[in-house]
């Protein structure tokens, strides 16, 4: 007589958590931080089509790490929900907190009830309506539906500890856009611990390696805006110059550089 396979509920939840964390850790990191004029998204992402950041509604932005097909379906569902709520009631009734709670309920339900959890971690960011002094808000939603709020910065993806440590040292409230981009890119370039006791040198991230977007509170209606590679190079002239000097080339960095990240 064979006995059916048995695992305790605690073991099942541990296995699901481990699966989700491993999937998220395989993704390249994303930094989201507040600056003087809104919210800045900086993702290590050389792709020009598979985006990690997006607009959800007028004053609300979205960022994610993990399995692309899973967080892309969540992104589209969030846009549809926000559009429906704004159409049915009022555009002012669509808030980042309500959307974050909806995402948390959806991810928590999948984690508890389905055999496989979503291997994603999300951020919903919101800036105040034009002309209002309310501070910007960041909401992190984990694979198990847990939600936390932040008003300074957060890091998602693989090797978050050294990046978060670098941000704690360099981040200051109310930075200008150029300084905020420099802080975020510098933190993303922080190498992970090699494990052999020797300090690794910081990585070099060019404009072609990055996906950068902002929520600009000074824009009257739609706050979300992407920064092109050319605009990013202007914000980070030091990075462009050092990159050219290291390579010995006389051209500026491009999106065609090979991807050397893990």
From Swiss-Prot:
Q: Specify the signal sequence span.
A: none
Query: Which Pfam families does the record match to this protein?
Result: Proteasome
Renumbered residue ranges of the record's region Disordered: 235-262
Entry's Gene Ontology molecular function annotations: threonine-type endopeptidase activity
Name the keywords, alphabetized: Cytoplasm, Proteasome
**Pathway where this protein functions:** Protein degradation; proteasomal Pup-dependent pathway
> What does the activity regulation annotation say?
The formation of the proteasomal ATPase ARC-20S proteasome complex, likely via the docking of the C-termini of ARC into the intersubunit pockets in the alpha-rings, may trigger opening of the gate for substrate entry. Interconversion between the open-gate and close-gate conformations leads to a dynamic regulation of the 20S proteasome proteolysis activity.
GO CC: one term? cytoplasm
Q: Where in the cell is it found?
A: Cytoplasm
Transcription found in the keyword field:
no
Using the UniProt record, give the first listed, main subcellular location: cytoplasm
* Biological process per Gene Ontology, one example term: modification-dependent protein catabolic process
InterPro entries per the UniProt record, alphabetical: Ntn_hydrolases_N, Proteasome_alpha-type, Proteasome_asu_bac, Proteasome_sua/b
Q: Which CDD domains match?
A: Ntn_hydrolase
Q: What does this gene product do?
A: Component of the proteasome core, a large protease complex with broad specificity involved in protein degradation.
Q: How does it assemble?
A: The 20S proteasome core is composed of 14 alpha and 14 beta subunits that assemble into four stacked heptameric rings, resulting in a barrel-shaped structure. The two inner rings, each composed of seven catalytic beta subunits, are sandwiched by two outer rings, each composed of seven alpha subunits. The catalytic chamber with the active sites is on the inside of the barrel. Has a gated structure, the ends of the cylinder being occluded by the N-termini of the alpha-subunits. Is capped by the proteasome-associated ATPase, ARC.
Recorded hits in HAMAP family, A to Z, give: Proteasome_A_B
Record's NCBIfam families? 20S_bact_alpha (TIGR03691)
Q: Which family does it belong to?
A: Belongs to the peptidase T1A family.
The name under which this protein is listed is: Proteasome subunit alpha
Name the source organism.
Answer: Gordonia bronchialis (strain ATCC 25592 / DSM 43247 / BCRC 13721 / JCM 3198 / KCTC 3076 / NBRC 16047 / NCTC 10667) (Rhodococcus bronchialis)
**Lineage start:** Bacteria, Bacillati, Actinomycetota, Actinomycetes, Mycobacteriales
Q: Which gene encodes it?
A: prcA
């Amino acid at each position: 007589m064979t006995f059916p396979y048995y695992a305790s509920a605690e073991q099942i939840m541990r296995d699901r958590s481990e699966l989700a964390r491993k999937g998220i850790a395989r993704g390249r990191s994303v930094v989201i931080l507040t600056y003087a004029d809104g919210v800045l998204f900086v993702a290590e992402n050389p792709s020009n089509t598979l985006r990690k950041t997006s607009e959800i509604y007028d004053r609300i932005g979205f960022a994610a790490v993990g399995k692309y097909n899973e967080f892309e379906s969540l992104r589209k569902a969030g846009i549809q929900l926000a559009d429906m709520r704004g159409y049915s009631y009022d555009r002012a009734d669509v808030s980042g907190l309500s959307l974050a709670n909806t995402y948390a309920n959806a991810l928590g339900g999948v984690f508890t009830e389905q055999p496989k959890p979503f291997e994603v971690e999300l951020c919903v960011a919101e800036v105040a309506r034009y002309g209002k002094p309310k501070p910007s808000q960041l909401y992190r939603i984990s694979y198990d539906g847990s939600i936390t709020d932040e008003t300074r910065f957060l890091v998602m993806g693989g090797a978050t500890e050294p990046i978060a440590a670098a941000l704690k040292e360099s981040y200051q409230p109310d930075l200008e856009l150029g300084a905020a981009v420099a802080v975020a890119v510098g933190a993303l370039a922080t190498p992970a611990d090699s494990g052999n006791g020797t300090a690794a040198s910081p990585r070099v991230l060019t404009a072609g390696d990055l996906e950068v977007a902002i929520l600009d509170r000074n824009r009257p209606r739609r706050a979300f805006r992407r920064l092109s590679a050319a605009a990013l190079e202007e914000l980070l002239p030091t990075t462009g110059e050092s990159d050219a000097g290291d390579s010995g080339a006389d051209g500026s960095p491009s999106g065609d550089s090979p991807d050397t990240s893990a």
